[in-house]
C-alpha cells in the first residue's frame, strides 16, 4: 500500500515537475512571413516591436502596430532605410496620453463649475486656493 502511494506520488512529481521545452512560452508566437511591399506612413502607426529569428520566427522583421487596434500588424524589413527612419520617429514621439477620465472639454458649463450639457458626467478639477493671510 505504501509502495503504491509512493509510486503514484513519484509519477505526479515527474509529470508536473519537469519543465516542458516545447510551447513553454505559453502559446504560439505570431510571426511575419513576408514584408510589406509598400512604405508604411507614420500617421497610421502607434508603435513597433522587433521579430528575431532566434525567437522562433523564420525572418527578422519589424512589426508596426497600427493606430486602429482592429487592424493587423504591418511587417517590414529592418534593413530598409524607411523602416529605420520610422522606428527613430516613433522612438522620439511620446505616446499620446489620454485624459485621465476620458472627458471631452465641457461645453455649456457655467462659470460656477456646474456640469454643462457636454460634460458627460466628468468631474472638473478644482484649483487649489492658497489661504489668504490672517
Curated annotation (Swiss-Prot):
Residue ranges, annotated region (C-terminal basic extension): 98-134
Annotated spans, Disordered: 88-134
Entry annotated with the keyword Secreted: yes
Keywords attached to this entry: Chemotaxis, Cytokine, Disulfide bond, Inflammatory response, Secreted, Signal
Compositionally biased residues, Basic residues: 112-122
A GO cellular-component term linked to this record: extracellular region
Biased composition, class Basic and acidic residues, residue ranges: 123-134
Tissue: Highly expressed in high endothelial venules of lymph nodes, spleen and appendix. Intermediate levels found in small intestine, thyroid gland and trachea. Low level expression in thymus, bone marrow, liver, and pancreas. Also found in tonsil, fetal heart and fetal spleen.
SUPFAM superfamilies: Interleukin 8-like chemokines (SSF54117)
Family: Belongs to the intercrine beta (chemokine CC) family.
Protein name according to UniProt: C-C motif chemokine 21
